[in-house]
């Protein structure tokens, strides 16, 4: 899975952006839970999810 491009995020509508932010936060929570219970098989997903969340939050902040 490649890291997402910022241009893809900038093309989202405000509603889609808010939905993607909530989705990324939930996924990060699930990954933390899996790591705590030693069920995480792909630790690189932390980096990808955090990167995607940072991009989403950056674009949200730019629009304010």
Curated annotation (Swiss-Prot):
GO terms for molecular function: structural constituent of ribosome. GO terms for cellular component: cytosolic large ribosomal subunit. GO terms for biological process: translation. Keywords: Ribonucleoprotein, Ribosomal protein. CDD domains: Ribosomal_L29_HIP. SUPFAM superfamilies: Ribosomal protein L29 (L29p). Belongs to the universal ribosomal protein uL29 family. This is Large ribosomal subunit protein uL29. It comes from Synechococcus elongatus (strain ATCC 33912 / PCC 7942 / FACHB-805) (Anacystis nidulans R2).
